[in-house]
Amino acid sequence: MEKMNQGDRPFMTIQRNDSSDHLVLHMKNEMRNTKYKPVDYQQLRVLTEAKKLASASAELKIRKAMLTSKISKEQTLIKQHKQVWWQEYQRLNEVRYKMESEIKSLLNEENIGNECLCDLTNFEQELSEQWCTYLKNVINPIQQLRADLKYRQHHTLQHSHPHVEFNSVKVLEEVDFVKKQLKTVFERLGLEQQRIENDLSGWSIKILDHSLEEKTNLLSELPIELGSLECPYPDLKSSIHSEFCKFTQKYQKKLQDVDLQLEDIYRNCQLSEEDHWIYQAILDQYPGDLFGRRTLYLDMLQRYFPHKSRHDLIEHEKYCDQYRFAMEQRKILISNWNKNKKDFTQKAVLTLIEACAAHEMESTLAKDKKKQQELCADLKAKVLQWRAHQEEVARLEMEISARRREKEEEKEKLWKKKELLQRAEKKKKIKKYWAMKKQKWQEMEMRDLQRLEELKKLMAEQSLKDRERVKYRKELLERRLMEKKEAALQEAHEDKERARRLEALRKQVAVVAQFDPVRMMSDTMASKARMGIEIEEEFILQKPLFTLNTYNEQQIISDPRLRFELALREAGLHRTLYAKEILPKISPRKPPRKDMESTVFKI
């Protein structure tokens, strides 16, 4: 148990009265009083020792519970770490298989240069030969030595005879020799790995520097679209160039500020490059949507870096967040620059195109005006010639129309004569047609009258049959209604008979109890047992020294104020402003009585 601080000690009050002072005075003056008995210090010591043992056992239980909770918490964290490791292992395997398949497909393609393909195949063959040599010279002898040692150990345990001697010194020398060889091999491999990593880091730095130089050059260079276009107005082109330079300088200044911020963050970083790489790899293992992600990766970082404190890791986390935020700002700045550059380029290109179009329009207007004047002269001559031709055409058309009109008048006279003859013939044909039509109508009327009389006879016969059918159906319906009424009466009679039999059966099995108000109002055996009435009190072996009229442990723990304060203390928040504001607002489970309310602090 941790010791409580000065501010965590409970507020205690000591009350004294005149009777206690008189008692002390009597004891000092050795004046006896029949009200008080002499103290049995031996019994008090025994009781005190018993209390000490009980408190020691309780403290031991609390320590065991804390140790158990700590172990369970550690096991839970390890279990969560295992789940994350397994997911990361599966993801890395998938990435590995994907990369291997992509490399194989790339090598199998025919569009790669022969020289590059030969270099890759030779490098792969060289690596496979080196791996086979490593297995043959390093791994296989170790496995053989291990199997030999296991066989010898098993053989000596089974056949432990006094005449069988096991040369352990020779075996230990052989094992030490193998260890030295392995140590030299691993040192050589470590140096080679360090050299390759240095080469890769150097190439990555060169690539990054080259990409940064390209980006800065791209920021400062004029777009190709603006440089390739020609503008007939030099003032407009120079103003566009100056506007682009101002625009670029503003973004370059912002980018330099962000780069300086990144350099400051990188300079203040406390971890080395390798430790930072391990830190980033551990953070990437835990996905963002994982519950308790920060707790898990901080625990894993403390395991990987035991020489670093939690405060140092949190500080490095802050630096990483700042670096990531600055990089995102840099990306957003570059993307905004590209977008604004594209918009500016489009607007500038449109402006230059409009200027070129306006210049071409002016030149074309001047050319068109000159052509118009030439055309006007040609058209005037052509109009005069066309007018003479038109007058001659009009004269000829008038003569032709006069001749055509005479021919049409003659044709019209002939057509009128023919039309009079055709009308006389048509009248004769119409009279003949109406006579035939009238005869057909009379025949159809006679046929319809005969059919009407036949239908009336059939309808009369059908109505007679329908009346007979309705009469039959009515009688059948009345018969069914009578049967239903009889069935309902029979069912009602059966229900009455069934109710009568049930009532007789109920009277046979009815319970007849005597009226006993004393027994009814007295306590039951169960209630007496629960209330402890008429039950002998159990003998309490260890009684307390003094009877205390206070709260028990369960009542104290059940108070929501204490539980909330313990939760804040475990979280380390009991000294914050939030705790100071929220603790007075929590009300107890049972409000205090009005006569017990203190008015000391209300004055």
UniProtKB/Swiss-Prot annotation:
<feature type="coiled-coil region">
    <location>
        <begin position="365"/>
        <end position="429"/>
    </location>
</feature>
<protein>
    <recommendedName>
        <fullName>Coiled-coil domain-containing protein 148</fullName>
    </recommendedName>
</protein>
<dbReference type="InterPro" id="IPR039902">
    <property type="entry name" value="CCDC148/CCDC112"/>
</dbReference>
<feature type="coiled-coil region">
    <location>
        <begin position="461"/>
        <end position="510"/>
    </location>
</feature>
<keyword id="KW-0175">Coiled coil</keyword>
